[in-house]
Amino acid sequence: ITTCKPASYLLNKAYIQGVPFYVDERVIVPRSYIGELLATGAEFLPAPDAVRSVLDLCTGSGCLAILAAYAYPEAEICAVDLSAAALDVARRNVAEHGMSERIALVEGDLFAPLGARKFDLILTNPPYVDAEAVASFPPEYRAEPVIAHAGGKDGLDIVRRIIAGAKAHLAPRGGVLCEIGTGRDILEADYPDIAFLWPDTEESEGEVFWLTREDFV
């Protein structure tokens, strides 16, 4: 049998940093670089005992919310996604990892359902693929939900919205960790007054940024 589906869909299983997650066609296959930064306790991130609240935007399968719960054992996690179908997958993963008491799953558009809530840490792996790249996806990527990839003409429409709203939802010493793919040059040109920190991972250079609340102008 020949198929262009990702192997993770056929097996209903994907791993980040060795941690297993259930996946199917309702979510993209998780492959975020943020997982490594959480697992290794990157030096710029707050200490585990300093984080009591984490927000995971565009949670998809819930993998980053769950990894955050492991990395920050005292924290309550809020995981938001626009897709009710994706949240059903996340709910299964949260239950399988025994995190139902610590991770709240919320349906909504980015910060919209959160009111005035503030968080010590915001994580997000939002859609960031530009329109041209989405149009030329190979078959295995076309099997994934396009809503989880498509970031507008230059790929950064949703990232810009996150930057615009993040400060209002960060606690005084809070920060945001956001994956953006290859859009670093565009983003730095758009925000010349913001000093982005671009941590590298084993498989990426300059594809994730870190900003503290004080970095926002």
Language-model region placement:
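SAM-dependent Rossmann-like transferase core, predominantly class I methyltransferases
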Residues: 2-73, 82-89, 112
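S-adenosylmethionine
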Residues: 39, 74-76, 80-217
